[in-house]
Amino acid sequence: MSAHTLDAYRRDLTALSAWASEQATDLVSLHPEQLRAFIAAEHRRRLSPKSLQRRLSACRSFYRWLLKHGRIDASPAATIRAPKAPRKLPQVLDVDEASRLVEVPTDVPLGLRDRALLELFYSSGLRLSELCALRWRDLDLAEGLVTVLGKGQKQRSVPVGSHARAALAAWRQERPADSDAPVFPGRNGPITPRAVQLRLNQLAQRQGLFKRVHPHLLRHSFASHVLESSGDLRGVQELLGHADIATTQIYTHLDFQHLAKVYDAAHPRAKRKR
């Protein structure tokens, strides 16, 4: 457990101890109803669902420890649930914005590298860590495939679009390298995630995208645009390398948002009065 988590848990248990004292009891003597009342009181204090979940997690860990050491007979936290945190929808670029971003000029220093990096990022929906770790041996430009090692050491192959293939070929011609070399080299080995983030911010402003653009935005945009065009949730899950399809389902909400906008703009009974 990290030092940051330990500090957070210490604050959570201190808050619970203070509340228990106000109720003329102590941590060891708390009943489930009292612990539930504590969580409700914290909710009324407008603690976020995420903070409440962490607070309850600290309580569960503490009472598991007491149970293990014979200080209590049962955990009062065992059956208590905190309010679920609302899941934020990921931000995405629309198709025009994504195209504008990746079509950076190639006749400037590092232009071919930047074009290849952005085209591949958007074309294949890679994670930032996967993109940075790429070696030329991982790319098959003739077949249009890139093979990456994702989370949980799971390997997957993802298609590479024609624009990305052309950009990568131009970049390799500009800077020849053997098959074991990084596709996007940095100062000492592969380019770092931080370097990609900084470069992306620079390029976004240069391309006229005056919004917060971060590396994962291209992966979100890839997923949203492929799902919008295909409607194949399972296919998008495999392309992204998600172990659980529930993780991919967040993009169906984005697709619904798009459909809702189309409906509002096109349906004769949905148009707003001016």
Label the model's feature ranges:
Residues 1-274:
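Conserved catalytic core of the tyrosine transesterase superfamily
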